[in-house]
Structure formats: structure tokens, C-alpha cells
Amino acid sequence: MGLRCDITLSITLVSPFLMPGLDVAALGIDAAALRDDCGKGCPIIPADQVKGLLSAACTTLAEAGVEIDGVAVTRTLIGRLFGRPSDEDGGEWGAPQRGAIIFGDLTAPPQIFGDLTAPPQKAASFTRVSIDGSTGAAKNGALQTVELVAPLGQRVTFSGTATVRFDPRTMPAPATKTAAEWVAALLHTALGVIPAVGGLKTAGFGQVAEASATMTHAE
């Protein structure tokens, strides 16, 4: 019998951070923030990025031999939860494995800083420059202006829901938790090994201050 549960995901980032969007924010802005399309201008971490981050983090847990409530995190389990290509790990060609988890976007409050199309926005950007390693001077034409959706140093919480649909008979039996609780615990643990989110991470953007996964509904 199939089960369904909802897990609330929450990631708090420290500004500056950037999930790059395609919109033109304002004249002179080279990298604009990705926002929702519901008319509220909420910054988001897109669902596919959330899935990719958590899948990679779970793989890290598997490689480290982590167990959660007596159940080892394995690539087979990760494949069941996140899906995998048809030709991966001996799978049948042309028959990809669908993932049990459906992720939604993680959304931050709207208009933290307002968007750059609504002035005044004097502090809503951050300027970067590339340095020539041989001369120590700024490279010609290597100035980048990045949109900020929150003041530097401010913590911004992105939250959303992941829906899990699975047959508990396909999951190992945890020692004390239900299968749904185990999946929530896995995602919570995986969030804890993600140091940064978004673009420009090597420049110090997207630091994760805290993150959590909590089961909110099961049926």
C-alpha cells in the first residue's frame, strides 16, 4: 500500500547569496536574483536545485557509511527516493527509476529589499571585481554587479514542501521510526552537510546558517 507524507524544508542563508535569474533587474545589474512568478517578487531556491543539493548530500552520507536509526544510507535507497537514470547501477535501459520525492521551490518572504525596479534601492547590489594574478591589478572589463535581495549579513529563511509517495515495503525497517519519519530524518541530516547554496559560493556567497526538515503530514 502506498503512503504519502509532506516534509517541510527550511534553509536559512546569510546575505550575500544569489540564485541567478534570467530577468533584467535594472540597468547596470549583471546578475539578477531568481524570483517566483506569482507576482509577489519572492526570492526562491528552485525545486531542481533543492533536489540536486539533497541528492548530492545524501550521496556524501552514503559514501561516509552513515546510518540513521539503524538503517544505512545506500545508493539504492537514494535511487528510490530521488530517482536515477535508466542505465545507472545496472538499471534496465530505457526504464528510468522515478523518484519518490517531489520537491517544491523554497521561498523567502517577498520584498525583503524590494526589487531593483522599484527605487530607491541604493544598497541593493554588490560589486565584485576580478584581479589579475600576475599584476595584482583589476582585470579590464571584469567588474560584476550582483543584485542583493537582503542587506549584507542578514539571515533570510527559505521554506517549502517536499512530498514523498512510496510503498513502505520497499524501505528497510528503522529501529524506532516509521518509514516516513526516517525519510524526514535523512533529509534533515543531509541538509546539515550542505555548507552553501546558490551561485558564487567560492566568493563566499550563500552561506547556510541553519537548515531543517520536519515531517508535517502523513497518510
Go through each PLM region and give its residues:
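RNA-binding basic/glycine-rich loop and surface signature characteristic of RAMP-family CRISPR effectors
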Residues: M1-E219
